[in-house]
């Protein structure tokens, strides 16, 4: 018995490490799974039979059948998981498609509109009758007239507001027709036109300017006393009045 154990240990040492590890793991898994069954297996003997060091027996056959069943169940479970994942993906895709369906329809419509050639649109425009074109032209004219009326009304209101603001100054202020006349005449009669412009501009102020007064105190008083108080100088008095006073 001791010699058999020593030989088993020597065989285990001589075996490749990866094969030994695979066989040991498989046999240990089988032993753990079947230990509560009617025929438990020895993992050491199972691993030797797995590595072809010992002739195969019932233990290795049992473990191999269990391993094949285990692989089938694992693959079946994986297949079910894959099917469930595929179903979930399909459901998610269908839900997204339902949500994006109106957006996709609008995009298709826009693509169709852009893909239609310009000649078709020209044909559609030519399908309108002359009556419709005349109606459109009449409507445009009415809009233009209404816009012009609004501008005229607006200008009149502005003028009224300005007249109220400046107290009639704009009505009294003359137009500068003299500048236009100068441009037309080429600069001729410039003094006369300028005098008329000044005369209209100052509103009769130039008419109140009087000529020089010829009396004695004109240089001294500048005509102020004569205009305001009607003062009569001695040079204008009658000298006979003084002689009569002296005679009396």
Swiss-Prot record:
It comes from the Eukaryota. Keywords: Cleavage on pair of basic residues, Disulfide bond, Endorphin, Neuropeptide, Neurotransmitter, Opioid peptide, Secreted, Signal. Residues 175-195 are annotated as: Disordered. Its main location: secreted. InterPro entries: Opioid_neupept (IPR006024), Proenkphlin_B (IPR000750). It is found in: Secreted. One of its GO terms (biological process) is neuropeptide signaling pathway. Residues 22-163, 177-199 form a propeptide. GO terms for cellular component: extracellular region; synapse. The N-terminal domain contains 6 conserved cysteines thought to be involved in disulfide bonding and/or processing. Residues 176-185 have a biased composition (Basic and acidic residues). GO terms for molecular function: neuropeptide hormone activity; opioid peptide activity. PROSITE patterns: OPIOIDS_PRECURSOR. Coiled coil: none annotated. Residues 1-21 form the signal peptide. The keyword Secreted applies. It holds the Pfam family Opiods_neuropep. Leu-enkephalins compete with and mimic the effects of opiate drugs. They play a role in a number of physiologic functions, including pain perception and responses to stress. Dynorphin peptides differentially regulate the kappa opioid receptor. Dynorphin A(1-13) has a typical opioid activity, it is 700 times more potent than Leu-enkephalin. Belongs to the opioid neuropeptide precursor family. This is Proenkephalin-B. It comes from Mus musculus.
